[in-house]
A protein has these predicted regions:
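Radical SAM enzyme [4Fe-4S]-AdoMet core and its adjacent flexible, acidic
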Residues: 25-154, 158-167
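Non-cysteine beta-strand/loop elements that form the S-adenosyl-L-methionine
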Residues: 4-23, 87-95
Length: 168
């Protein structure tokens, strides 16, 4: 929380955090093999308690969808935690196979089912009243960067299918 306050004071106020729903601990384990979801959620809850009039930030909670992912209870959980805080919204994205280590363990959505499943999840967000990210690709924004777990810095995740998404 202390570091986050420093970021806010420095003008760094917009974040995208990927949470893979209830499967998060499987899809994004800590290097130790332990789960990371509880720590991330606890940190986000702490940030949501910062006074909005003093801390004007924006956090997009990105939900990656795998094949067959139709459990909407994750959104109910997020709504209970952050649904009344306008500083939080949700972005729903289909998982693609971008190659690399661990990609063979994923169940990416087939092209013909991606749009349908994403639309179902977006409709559920609308039904419960959870704010959602406007789905505009951040590639067009010059200051959107990705900090990868291996320490590399890249351009927005929407540019992954383009050559050279890593910054030198």
């Amino acid at each position: 929380e202390k570091l986050f306050r420093q970021f806010c004071q420095a003008g760094i106020t917009s974040y995208q955090i990927t949470l893979d729903g209830w499967n998060h601990d499987k899809t994004r384990p800590h290097v130790s093999g332990k789960g990371t979801l509880r720590t991330i959620i606890d940190n986000l809850v702490a940030l949501s308690k910062l006074p909005p009039e003093e801390y004007s930030f924006h956090i997009t909670l990105r939900r990656n969808l795998l094949a067959g992912d139709e459990d909407y209870s994750w959104y109910d959980y997020l709504y209970r935690l952050f649904g009344q805080d306008k500083r939080f919204d949700v972005l729903v994205c289909a998982v693609g196979d971008w190659g690399g280590k661990g990609s063979h363990d994923l169940s990416p959505l087939h092209q013909d089912t991606q749009e349908v499943l994403v639309a179902k999840h977006i409709a559920y967000l609308d039904k419960i009243g959870m704010l959602r990210y406007n789905q505009m690709y951040c590639v067009s924004r010059p200051n959107r960067l990705v900090f990868w777990p291996d320490g590399k810095i890249g351009k927005c995740t929407a540019a992954l299918n383009r050559p050279q998404p890593q910054l030198e």
